[in-house]
Amino acid sequence: MSSHDDDHTPLLISDPSVNKPFRSRTPSPEREYCSDCPLQAKGSACNGNSHSLKHETNGASSSNNNVAKSSSHDSFKAKPKNYDSTSNSNEPISFNEPDSSNSHHNNESICNNDNCCREIARRRSLSPLLILPLNFINAFSWGMIEIPLLFLLRQELCAIHYNLDPTQLSPDDPICRLAEITTGVSKVRAAFGSLAAFLGLFSTAYYGTMGDIYGRRLVLFITVSFLLLGDLWLLYQSYAPKHPYFVLFAAALKGLGGYISTVVASQNSFVADCSKTEFRAWYLGLNFAAYHLGTALGPSLSGFIVQYTPHMYYVFYITSTFWIIYLLYVWLILPESLDVSESKEQQNKISGFSSIWRSCLEPLIILWPRSLCTEESCEFHQYDINADTHAGRRHWDVLLAAILISLTLLGAGSMGLLPLYTDYKFGWGPMKASLILSTDSFASSITLVALFPLLSKVIEKIIEKLYSSEGLFEDPSRADNTSSLQGIRNVFSYLVRPGYSRSSILRGRTADEKYTIVKRDVWNAQLGYAIALSAAVLLAVAKSDVALFTAVIIQAISNMVVPCVQSIALNGVQSEYNGRVLAAFAVFEAVALIIRGPIYAFVYTESMKVSYPNMIFFLSAVIYGCCFIIIFFMRLYRPLNRKR
């Protein structure tokens, strides 16, 4: 391979449409690549010029742009290059034989001229903010049913305890404030969440793969239809309260719709499809901010209805209406973020699973780091810059991120019992219990919209100062962040800026930029877990209303960890795997939701026997401590320098 050829050969990354994928390589400032169009070089589709990189099968070169001059067969069998971490040259190495290499370049199905990049440009120009109204509606509807569901169960169990008709009791009747009734409510509520999450575990993975093939809109429409049916059943139950276990049918309907995880994962996939790499964490943060805003307003309204109106079923009328609005928005307004014109082979993959169990486990394959290297080719479905060696080192960030997200949900299980805890220990009613949940969600929204981007910008500046002596940040593409006030401006610009501006569509990511993004998110996550641990301890020792509200506000600041961890993981995979990664995360979330209800119900019941109901918060503190330790094992995307 000639030196001239080395200087201009495009950097290639593995792609599912390529039979023998190339090695992922460190991009250099002179040769940036289109990560979504692996066979397009800088100066071609990335810059608007539609010339393809084709090698003629007879060994001669037909490119008049000096893109790829073919060399003889003997040059491919030259002495292998030596890799060394002290050299600054960035020469790409192909492990493919000439014939197979030519076949890759001649495969027009991979990227027919600039058609591939044109499609990526189209969906990157979609604004991730289009999903925010749906995220709000989803969270608002889920938030509204939490307080009514708890007090509906409390009313029905209290009627059984006193052998009364449920209609003779008000939802917040003081005679129902007994330890055995409170623990009974926690058990039924745990069964509700576990059943829905268990069914969601099997449906979420299937919906995730379906979303990558048929598009996000179809998945959202199907899943929300099941959620609507679940709320209609709760509406019937609130009209005529029966046995508390009748509400489990609503849990089954919601589970068939993927429960909470599928809708959230599909919404996050839309954000990942349409957002640029360096803005992805902030857009995911805005997504979570909209979610927390909905969970803030929902409990407040439902708590007011339960406490000050005689009819609890008003709540479920409202939630059913909002789900209908959600469906209309998806049908009439939301654009599709993916090109759904996939091959029949891929479409058969989603319909030809031998079992539901296999469909559940299929997306989890993306979490396992795979590196298969031979003398001819290397295949990476996950990649990092460190892994560009003959040996091919695995990187575990995606799997660790899935574990962290599931543990974070598990640690948050104590917040679900907070209304029961405050009702029993402090004598709060539905309205006050809903206010503390709303406070948590409002504080989370402010954190993710304002505090998180500013903190990220400060940490990014610190990283630049600490590591500038190593030359990691001397890249011209970073010149757009010259002012220290840019972080403040970004708070507002993130609200209106689309995921990709036309001027920067498909600009390649350099090693310096990726290193900065990942290390910044790692530091944010470490800080968030430390705050979560402290807040859980404060909740456990709180003796007054003021102390409880203060601890909840501090705990809300830690909610930035989820978008940070997701951003770390998504920066470690190719963009075409975003949907599968988030679907795999949703499976882990479903597992956490399955087990956290019974775990916290058991701990709460046992601690009530010894008059220590605050043990649930100490359990959360232990879980957050484990997360704080795990985050230190996540690897960074450091540049790998080579010499010939």
From Swiss-Prot:
**UniProt keyword Membrane present:** yes
- Topological type in the membrane: Multi-pass membrane protein
Polar residues biased stretches: 83-106
| Single GO term (MF) | transmembrane transporter activity
Phosphoserine modification sites? Answer: 28
State where the protein is found.
Answer: Membrane
Superkingdom of the organism of origin:
Eukaryota
Q: Which residues cross the membrane?
A: 131-151, 190-210, 218-238, 245-265, 286-306, 314-334, 398-418, 435-455, 522-542, 546-566, 583-603, 614-634
Region Disordered: start and end of each range? 1-35, 48-106
| Compositionally biased region (Low complexity) | 58-70
Q: Name a GO CC annotation attached to this entry.
A: fungal-type vacuole membrane
Any one GO biological process: transmembrane transport
* One Pfam family here: MFS_1
Q: Which protein, by its recorded name, is this? A: Uncharacterized membrane protein C14C4.07
Gene source species: Schizosaccharomyces pombe (strain 972 / ATCC 24843) (Fission yeast)
